[in-house]
Amino acid sequence: MGGYKGIKADGGKVNQAKQLAAKIAKDIEACQKQTQQLAEYIEGSDWEGQFANKVKDVLLIMAKFQEELVQPMADHQKAIDNLSQNLAKYDTLSIKQGLDRVNP
């Protein structure tokens, strides 16, 4: 991966970040589905009363929050992919070569 004074990127770390971001995205989606299913199970069960309703409401709030994390996580993955691709090209950019001549 490319680099310039003050700009450092370790190719292995960027790849690790890509792998971890993919795992996190997958885990968030799985967790959201499980939370939603649990809320639906409670709603359809014989468990009734104020406490049951509060537990279900909390689970629905959690499921909504988890659902809202899906798009930002996808954006994060795209940003890491773009970083990886652009850093690989960094050393060949004419602006970088010009900066090297000005600031050796």
Curated annotation (Swiss-Prot):
Keywords annotated in UniProt: Secreted, Virulence
SUPFAM superfamilies for the chain: EsxAB dimer-like
Primary location class: secreted
A cellular component term, taken from the record's GO annotations: extracellular region
Organism (species): Staphylococcus aureus (strain N315)
Domain of life: Bacteria
Cellular localisation: Secreted
Annotated Pfam families: WXG100
Protein name according to UniProt: Type VII secretion system extracellular protein B
Protein purpose: Virulence factor that is important for the establishment of infection in the host. EsxB is required for EsxA synthesis as well as secretion. Mediates together with EsxA the release of S.aureus from the host cell. Also inhibits host cytokine production and thus modulates dendritic cell-mediated immunity.
Family affiliation: Belongs to the WXG100 family.
Isomerase as UniProt keyword: no
Known partners and oligomeric status: Homodimer. When mixed with EsxA does not form heterodimers.
